Amino acid sequence: MSAQPISDFHAYPDAAGHFGKFGGRFVAETLIAPLQELSAAYDLARQDPAFIAEYDKDLKHYVGRPSPIYHAERLSREVGGAQILLKREDLNHTGAHKINNTIGQALLASRMGKTRIIAETGAGQHGVASATVAARLGLECVVYMGATDIERQKINVYRMQLLGAKVIPVTSGSATLKDALNEAMRDWVSNVQDTFYIIGTVAGPDPYPRMVRDFNAIVGREARAQMLEDYGRLPDAISACVGGGSNAIGLFHAFLNDPGVKIYGAEAAGDGIASGRHAASIAAGRPGVLHGNRTYVICDDDGQIIETHSVSAGLDYPGVGPEHAFLSDSGRAVYQGITDDEALAAFHLLAHTEGILAALESSHAVAQSIKLAREMPKDALVLCNLSGRGDKDVHTIAAREGMVL
């Protein structure tokens, strides 16, 4: 916990990219100049009315924003307790929140004169969103993806290829998201003159955590305005899944200075925290440096990263965005572990009661929202970020339940 209460959470990060003791820029000398170039370009763009107007236009006419808030009435009745509301990011073009960020970064890449974009992906949604905007803007696109994730997300791999992207399997380490990010960083160092690296989450060295947050903050700004317009008040609690944490910080940011709104993040507890097979960096990690920033990481006593596990490829990451680490330490947000089984149960319950197939990532937040709702009065409001749709996960769920499709 922080020694003194924080009056303005929107004042972070500081000029050096720090969220309290987290964040920063811990990278090899070869990346300092590219990061400085990127930071300067972003700081100019974010203050340019023409850039903002182009971004807003694409969000409306290409992505399909605003995404609605849906009252899950039958789910709420089934669960008992508070009313569960869903922020429907699954209805965006490409089926998740990821395109909010890739649109912004791709426009910035074009503004900087870059002709090639690279990306890492876990569940494949960020890869699809990157390939999508690359096709629209006429940019070459290369996506790095762990071989393990390629096996469990074959549909998204083919979607990327249909969009013209080259998907490169990564077989090092655990062959998942962290390894894909490592390979993408290596590519960027070697090809920085013409290449822009679109990181998909609020991790990495500064300016990535704040830049990805800013491009996703539309989620929370919309949600806050929609709550006031449709319900006449703010929600009592908000919930989102947290791997790196881009969808979560996108929702959380607009509510950080609203003390009456409780904030909850759902981490991937996998087979249970005690089992050691999980990806709950805040619940079971310790401070360390990963992918260029200081945050909570899952590591051994020697500081070596431990292999993580989650049924959800998008949450299978041994770190968390530095702003989430900061929000946890400050006490502003509470992060809880949701197991694979709890997420799958929530997936099925939402499908049966509301006719919505949520992504496995999002199903962790649905499970958390169900737990919260059960402990709250009937007139309370819980807003859950439904960050993506579950079409991509149907084969994974079927295989886990013994079905061959």
Swiss-Prot record:
Modified residues (N6-(pyridoxal phosphate)lysine): K98
SUPFAM superfamilies, per the entry: Tryptophan synthase beta subunit-like PLP-dependent enzymes (SSF53686)
Keywords, alphabetical: Amino-acid biosynthesis, Aromatic amino acid biosynthesis, Lyase, Pyridoxal phosphate, Tryptophan biosynthesis
UniProt name for this protein: Tryptophan synthase beta chain
Cofactors that this protein relies on: pyridoxal 5'-phosphate
Keyword DNA-binding appears in the UniProt entry: no
Gene this protein is translated from: trpB
GO biological process: L-tryptophan biosynthetic process
GO cellular component, one term: cytoplasm
Family designation: Belongs to the TrpB family.
